Design a protein with these regions (language model features):
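Proteins with a high burden of low-complexity, intrinsically disordered sequence enriched in S/T/G/P/A and R
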Residues: 1-10, 28, 40, 99, ...
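C-terminal lobe/tail of nucleotide-utilizing enzymes
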Residues: 77-186
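Conserved catalytic-core segment of NTP-binding enzymes
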Residues: 15-26, 30-120, 126
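P-loop/Walker-type NTP enzyme "switch/lid" segment
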Residues: 1-26, 126-130, 134-135
Length: 186
């Protein structure tokens, strides 16, 4: 469900919202609900026992992290303890220079398991501008989203990349390639 385009989120009644959720849950394995940044007082009433898990998506900046902390606190008070975080719009160069928090730092700050990290990706932005699926084509952002989807829908152990982490010369020389590659070093 996309984020509300209403002038005020309170225009959506909690009872109607729960009915919509029940209908969707009976037809789909997963229902993702987008919400505006933060959690307004009017949105708090929409939280219901129909929601099984909260996945907070935030960018690695102080304002967004504080907002995510407040949202997580409200969710916990409402009894929703299954929470994970996705860190969006990571820039590896900024992380290496210490100008941006790494995804693991954000997850530790929020005291939530890290579901995934999505790098800043011009291809994702271009797809959004052209109203195309971000899953078409090949890009690092698309691959990150696919890994997150796998983590959400399977028990498969999907490794988390570490955008912006410094690697030693030894790590760069002898890092294993993906399964199926002929060479074992890159």
């Amino acid at each position: 469900l996309p984020a509300s385009q209403f002038a005020r989120a309170k225009e959506l009644e909690a009872k109607a919202f729960r009915k919509i959720l029940r209908t969707l849950k009976s037809n789909f394995d997963h229902v993702l609900i987008d919400a505006p940044a933060g959690i307004e007082r009017s949105l708090r009433g929409l939280l219901s026992n129909e929601i099984n898990e909260c996945v907070l998506v935030c960018t690695p900046d102080d304002v967004c992290i504080r907002n995510a902390e407040r949202t997580a606190s409200v969710m916990r008070k409402k009894g929703l303890t299954a929470q994970r975080v996705i860190v969006n719009r990571l820039n590896p160069d900024y992380i290496r220079r210490g100008e941006m928090y790494a995804a693991q730092t954000v997850a530790l700050t929020l005291d939530m398991p890290l579901l995934g990290e999505i790098p800043e990706d011009a291809e994702i932005y271009r797809a959004l501008l052209h109203h195309q699926s971000v899953m078409e084509g090949e890009s690092e952002g698309r691959n990150a989203i696919a890994r997150i989807a796998l983590r959400m829908t399977t028990d498969e152990d999907v490794p988390l990349p570490e955008y912006g982490q410094k690697r030693t010369l030894f790590q760069r020389l002898f890092q294993r390639r993906k399964k199926g590659d002929e060479k074992h070093v890159r």
